[in-house]
Amino acid sequence: MMLMSLLLVLSLERLITKTPNWHIEKYAAQYRAFLQDKGLIKFQEGNEDEEGSKKVSSTALYFYLLLPAVVLGAIEYWVLGAFLTFIEQSIILFICIGCPALRAVYKSFLNAADRGDLQACSMYTDQLGHCASQTDSDGSAGTEGKTFGQHLTWLNYQHYAAVMLWFIAFGAPGAQFYSLSRSTTEALCDANHPLKAAAGRLMFALDYIPVRVTAFGMLMMGHFSRALPEWIKYALQFDVPAYDVLTQISSKAEILTPDEQQLQAENAAIEPKVLVKLAKRNVIFLLVITSALTLVGSLA
């Protein structure tokens, strides 16, 4: 059932242009607004026991991020049958996976790079909006392409590979929990909210295994001998951000040829295109592994 849902959703995601009603960001924003209106999540400021208040707020954040997934899992277990669960899981996965805005920014970046408009390339890189990893640029075509390619690799992981892995491991509740946590972390980071550090710690934990599985897929689909030492280096490190793990390994897994490096100096789109191809091959790798696990009976 999981494999069928993945194949169905990935096919539809490629064929259909999603409206906001079919993307997690809309519902995550509504959920956060509901919690805010009810006063269920807020940073409790005060001179007395400030650390205790912060801890309570962090615990509340984790609880309310997990709550919808628990409710969804209970509904699947006690209410829905096998067929309805398949329909429900496919719908939830379709809502959680992908990012129409990311795809639009990518196309705009390619057009700007083809025109040689580096200022527009820099603007589109900023529009990718990964709050926790802002990278400086010297304005050259090579640097703009590298910066955009790194952000694109990370966001592609967050919106595709990570969602797939959480879905494979825990079904629709897992995909929903990860997507809601990712969206909330970005919102708190953009707003410079006091809880952004707590949300960041949660995402570090949620990404720790999936990002290494994804990076392993990239080295399998790319230059294995070059990327393997880098993967081993980061495999058990607990102090390296997931963003750095993925971008460092992907840069080793897919190295530009001399001709591509020469073109990259003039056209910022070369490296992002190469990394997107690597990400697509990685998705296929994850599907193949899922198929194998399904055949041996490890997945339902």
Specify the residue positions occupied by each region the protein language model found.
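Hydrophobic N-terminal alpha-helices or hydrophobic patches in metabolic proteins across all domains
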Residues: 1-300
